[in-house]
C-alpha cells in the first residue's frame, strides 16, 4: 500500500519525559513499554530525580472490552466457516454464500451495538466510552454494508438503487423518531413536524408509509382532501423496481417518464399551490435539487441526499456512474461549510470502487484491524485482490490478517482465536505462529497444555520443546519435582531430566523416601532419556522389589546399578547402605562373587572421596557419621562373605 498521507496520531503520556532524559522502550506483542533512562539529553547538565514509573502503552484497547470480545469470538467462527467452504461452492451459489457471510458479519456488529446501547443507558460513568465505541461500530457497519452492495452483490443498474435505498433506511432512522413523536401527540396533523414525517418517508422511498400518514391529513381537512387524493395518487403510481422482477429497464424508464410528466403537470397547473407542504413534496418527487437541499436536516447525511437524489432523478443509475453523483452530492450537501470527515472519504472511495483506498482510509481511523482484516478476506474470496501483492511476499489479505491475529495474541484468552487466522495465511502464517507461541505467557498449566496441543497438532517441534522447558523450569522453581520431570520428558531434554533426577535423589537422601511415586513407577521407556533418569527409575524398582520381599532380584538390580556407574558419586554410599538389610538377612542373598563386587565398589567410593578431599578435611571427617557407616558396611560385607563361602562350599560338596 502507499505511504500514509496523514501524520500518525500523537499519544501524550502524563509524567513521561519531564526530567529531560532520553526515553527507553521495549516492544511487546501489542504493547509498548516506556521508561526514562539515566542518560540526559544534550545541553542539560542539571541533575534531576529519576522517574520511578514505567509506562505500558497498549495499541489496541478494544480487545479488553467485554462486548467487543464477543465480536471477536463470533466473527472468528464466521471467518473459519468461510475458509472451510471456499472450495465447496461456485458460480451463483458461491455469490449467494458470500453475501450471506457478509450479512452474518454485519449481524454480529449490530448485536454488539445494541448491547453497547443498553450498557450506555445503564452505566453513567462509562457512558461516553460506550457512545464512542457505538459510533465506531456504526461507521463499520455502514461502510461494510455499502461494500457488500457494491463489491459482493455487484448489483447492476436498477437493483442497485433498491439496495442503496435499503442501506439508507437501515442507517438513517431520524424520520422514524419524528413520526413516533407525531403519532404520540393528540392531534398528529397539527404537530409541527407532521410534514417532516411525510417528506422524510418520501425521501427514503417509503411511499406506503407516507400515504398512511397523508391519509390523516385528508381525514381532518375537507379543503385539503382533493389535494391529498392527488398527492396520494402520485405516490401510489410512482414506479419502483423490485429485485427478481421481470420488468426490463426500458419498460421501467418509460413508466417513470410518464409518471414524472404527470407530477410536473400538476405542479405547473398549481394543483398544490394552496399548500406549501404538498407542493414541496411534489417538487421532491420531481428531484428538485434546491428543495432537496432545503430538506437536508431530514436527511442528515450527504449519502442520504445522494440516494434520494438518484431515486427522483436517475433511478437507473449504473455502478460506473456512482462516483460522479457521490462527489457532486457531497459538495452540494456540505456547500463549503465544512470539510469531509474520515467516514466521508471511506464512502467516497467505495462509490469510486477503489477498495484499496477504502482499506487504507479505515486502517488510518480505526483503533484495531478487525474491520479491514475481515472485509479484505471476504473481498479476496470474491477475487478482487488477485493482482495486489505486497513487496515482502504476502498479499494484502494476508498482511492484514497477520496484524489482526498478532493483536489477538496480546490478550490472555483471545490468543487462541489468532491461531486459526495464522493457519489461513499460507505464506507467513506458520512463521508468525511459531514466534508468537514462543512468547505466550504460560501463567497456568492449563494454558500451557492448550499451547502445547496447538504446537503438536501443527508439528512445531521446537515450540513444543520450548513450552515444555519453560513449564519444567517453572515447576522446578516451585519445587514441584514430579511436574518438572514430566515436562522435561515431554521436551525430550536429557540435560534437564538429569538435573531433576538429581533433585529427586537429593530429596531421597534428606527425607528417606520419594515423592511422586506414580510418575516414577510409570516412567516406562521414558527413563531411557538420560542415564540419571534410568538410574532413578531402576532405583525405585529396587525399592519396590525389596518391599515385595523379592530379595534376590533386588540384590542383583542393586549390584548392577552400582557396577554400571550411572549413579552420581554422592549417591554411592546410599546405594551401599541399601545393601545392609540384604547382607543381614538370615538367608544368604549376595554370593561370594557379588560380595567381592560390593567390596570393590566400597573401596572405589572411598578412593574417589580421598582424591577429592584435602588432608585437613580428612582429619575433620575421621569421626563423621559416614565413617561409622563405612565401618558397619565393611563388617557386614566381611560377615556375608564368610557366610557365602561356607554356603557355596557346602553346596559344592
UniProtKB/Swiss-Prot annotation:
Superkingdom of the source species: Eukaryota
Main subcellular localisation: nucleus
Gene Ontology cellular component terms for the protein in this record: cytosol; nuclear membrane; nuclear pore outer ring
InterPro entries attached to this UniProt entry: Nucleoporin_Nup85
One biological process term in Gene Ontology: protein import into nucleus
UniProt GO MF annotations: structural constituent of nuclear pore
UniProt entry keywords in alphabetical sequence: Membrane, mRNA transport, Nuclear pore complex, Nucleus, Protein transport, Translocation, Transport
Location(s), subcellular: Nucleus, Nuclear pore complex; Nucleus membrane
Keyword Cell wall biogenesis/degradation in record: no
Subunit structure: Component of the nuclear pore complex (NPC).
Family that this chain belongs to: Belongs to the nucleoporin Nup85 family.
Main function: Component of the nuclear pore complex (NPC) that seems to be required for NPC assembly and maintenance. Involved in nephrogenesis.
Protein name in UniProt: Nuclear pore complex protein Nup85
Organism: Xenopus laevis (African clawed frog)
Gene: nup85
Amino acid at each position: 500500500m502507499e505511504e500514509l498521507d496523514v501524520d500518525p496520531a500523537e499519544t501524550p503520556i502524563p509524567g513521561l519525559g519531564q526530567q529531560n532524559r532520553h526515553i527507553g522502550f521495549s516492544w511487546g506483542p501489542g504493547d509498548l513499554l516506556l521508561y526514562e533512562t539515566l542518560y540526559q539529553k544534550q545541553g542539560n547538565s542539571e541533575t534531576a530525580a529519576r522517574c520511578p514509573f514505567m509506562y505500558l502503552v497498549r495499541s489496541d484497547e478494544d480487545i479488553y472490552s467485554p462486548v467487543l470480545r464477543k465480536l471477536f469470538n463470533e466473527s472468528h467462527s464466521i471467518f473459519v466457516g468461510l475458509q472451510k467452504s471456499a472450495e465447496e461452492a461456485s458460480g451463483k451459489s458461491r455469490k449467494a454464500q458470500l453475501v450471506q457471510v457478509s450479512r452474518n458479519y454485519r449481524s454480529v456488529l449490530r448485536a454488539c451495538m445494541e448491547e453497547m446501547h443498553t450498557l450506555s443507558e445503564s452505566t453513567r460513568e462509562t457512558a461516553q466510552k460506550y457512545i464512542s465505541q457505538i459510533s465506531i461500530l456504526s461507521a463499520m457497519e455502514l461502510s461494510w454494508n455499502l461494500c457488500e452492495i457494491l463489491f459482493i452483490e455487484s448489483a447492476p443498474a436498477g437493483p442497485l438503487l433498491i439496495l442503496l435505498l435499503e442501506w439508507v433506511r437501515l442507517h438513517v432512522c431520524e424520520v422514524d423518531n419524528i413520526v413516533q413523536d407525531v403519532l404520540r401527540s393528540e392531534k398528529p396533523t397539527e404537530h409541527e413536524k407532521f410534514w417532516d414525517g411525510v417528506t422524510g418517508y418520501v425521501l427514503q422511498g417509503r411511499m406506503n408509509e407516507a400515504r398512511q400518514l397523508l391519509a390523516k391529513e385528508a381525514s381532518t381537512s375537507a379543503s385539503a382532501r382533493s389535494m391529498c387524493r392527488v398527492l396520494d395518487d402520485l405516490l401510489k403510481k410512482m414506479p419502483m423496481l423490485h429485485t427478481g422482477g421481470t420488468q426490463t429497464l426500458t419498460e421501467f424508464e418509460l413508466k417513470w417518464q410518464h409518471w414524472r410528466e404527470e407530477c410536473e403537470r400538476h405542479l405547473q397547473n398549481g394543483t398544490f399551490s394552496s399548500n406549501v407542504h404538498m407542493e414541496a413534496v411534489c417538487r421532491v418527487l420531481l428531484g428538485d435539487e434546491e428543495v432537496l437541499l432545503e430538506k437536508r436536516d431530514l436527511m442528515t447525511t450527504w449519502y442520504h441526499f445522494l440516494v434520494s437524489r438518484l431515486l427522483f432523478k436517475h433511478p437507473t443509475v449504473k455502478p460506473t456512474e456512482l462516483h460522479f453523483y457521490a462527489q457532486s452530492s457531497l459538495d452540494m450537501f456540505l456547500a463549503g461549510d465544512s470539510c469531509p470527515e474520515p467516514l466521508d472519504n471511506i464512502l467516497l472511495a467505495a462509490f469510486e470502487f477503489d477498495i484499496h483506498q477504502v482499506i487504507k482510509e479505515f486502517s488510518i481511523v480505526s483503533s484495531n484491524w478487525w474491520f479491514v482484516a475481515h472485509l479484505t478476506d471476504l473481498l479476496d474470496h470474491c477475487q478482487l485482490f488477485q493482482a495486489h501483492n505486497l513487496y515482502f511476499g504476502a498479499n494484502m489479505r494476508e498482511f492484514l490478517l497477520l496484524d489482526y491475529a498478532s493483536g489477538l495474541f496480546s490478550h490472555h484468552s483471545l490468543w487462541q482465536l489468532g491461531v486459526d487466522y495464522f493457519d489461513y495465511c499460507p505464506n507467513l502464517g506458520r512463521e508468525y505462529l511459531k514466534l508468537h507461541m514462543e512468547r505466550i505467557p504460560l501463567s497456568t498449566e492449563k494454558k500451557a497444555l492448550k499451547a502445547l496441543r496447538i504446537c503438536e497438532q501443527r508439528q512445531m517441534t521446537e515450540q513444543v520443546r520450548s513450552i515444555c522447558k519453560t513449564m519444567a523450569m517453572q515447576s522446578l522453581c516451585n519445587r514441584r519435582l514430579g511436574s518438572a520431570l514430566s515436562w522435561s520428558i515431554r521436551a525430550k531434554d536429557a540435560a534437564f531430566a538429569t538435573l531433576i533426577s538429581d533433585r529427586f535423589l537429593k530429596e531421597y537422601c534428606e527425607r528417606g523416601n520419594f515423592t511422586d511415586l506414580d510418575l516414577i513407577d510409570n516412567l516406562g521407556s521414558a527413563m531411557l532419556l538420560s542415564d540419571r533418569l534410568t538410574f532413578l527409575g531402576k532405583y525405585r524398582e529396587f525399592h519396590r522389589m525389596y518391599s515385595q520381599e523379592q530379595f534376590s532380584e533386588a540384590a542383583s538390580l542393586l549390584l548392577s546399578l552400582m557396577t554400571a556407574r550411572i549413579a552420581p558419586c554422592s549417591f554411592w554410599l546410599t546405594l551401599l547402605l541399601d545393601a545392609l538389610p540384604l547382607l543381614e538377612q538370615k538367608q544368604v542373598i549376595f554370593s561370594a562373587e557379588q560380595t567381592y563386587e560390593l567390596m570393590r565398589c566400597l573401596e572405589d567410593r572411598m578412593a574417589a572421596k580421598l582424591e577429592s578431599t584435602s588432608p585437613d578435611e580428612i582429619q575433620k571427617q575421621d569421626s563423621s557419621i559416614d565413617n561409622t557407616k563405612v565401618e558397619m558396611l565393611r563388617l557386614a560385607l566381611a560377615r556375608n562373605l564368610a557366610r557365602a563361602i561356607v554356603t557355596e562350599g557346602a553346596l559344592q560338596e
